[in-house]
Amino acid sequence: MKLHPLIAGLTLALASSMCLTGCGTSHQEKSGAGPSSATASASSGYPATVMSCAEKLTFTEAPKRVLLLEDTDAPTLSMLDLLDKVSARAGKIDTSGYDVNTATKLKAIPQMKGTSLATGGVSVSTESILDAHIDLVIGYDLGVDRKALAKAGVKLYSPDANCDDQTPVNHADFGLVTKEVTKVGAIFGVPERAATLNKALKKQTADLPKHAAGKGVSAAALW
């Protein structure tokens, strides 16, 4: 199962149309003068718990080696300046909707061998994932063996729109995008960065009507 196209379109359109410079590199990070461990723990929000479909995942530190199935959550990771956490990707990625910088980063991520699914998407064996020392897979249940990975200590995070147990989404409410940003920010210990991004995204969508041109215009499209 792949990300619901309406939600993917909203997220990708916003990711391509905005650039938050320096959101992942603070003055402290550049200078090496970081906060105390207690302060860092508090600001990171750990331990953080998020739902991955029906499974509750708890993170005590940021994932270091991430596998992406196709480009699941790639726009969100890009906007949060977290693509450097992705060690491998599997499946095809259509980079035509991304800005040049993000597309270049995605293409540079090493590709892991997978099997194309008849319903779309890609499947990767547990052995391949463990051999690559992956600690988090961002994707969908059809692509991996969730239970086998859990036994090996590897988490599978699936966005809400990828879950079979969720009520089908017929209308892509913008709240789904900001909710996903919040969840990914929690997983990687950057809740403040996620909050800042959500504020910017909400402002951007609120400003859309101001930029609409033409007599009788009553709608603006994000995708």
Outline where the language-model segments fall.
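Extracytoplasmic substrate-binding proteins
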Residues: K56, A150-W223
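Bacterial lipoprotein signal-peptidase II cleavage site
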Residues: C19-S36
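Extracytoplasmic low-complexity, Pro/Thr/Ser/Ala/Gly-rich segments
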Residues: G32-M79, I93
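Sec-dependent bacterial lipoprotein signal peptides
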Residues: M1-T21
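Stable alpha-helical elements in mature extracytoplasmic
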Residues: D73-T76, L82, S125, D141, ...
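Structural recognition of the beta-strand scaffold that forms the well-ordered cores
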Residues: L67-L69, S87-A90, L136-G139, L156-P159, ...
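Short helices/loops that flank or line small-molecule/ion binding pockets
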Residues: V122-I134, K151-A152
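A short, structured surface patch at a secondary-structure boundary
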Residues: L68-L69, A74-S128, P159
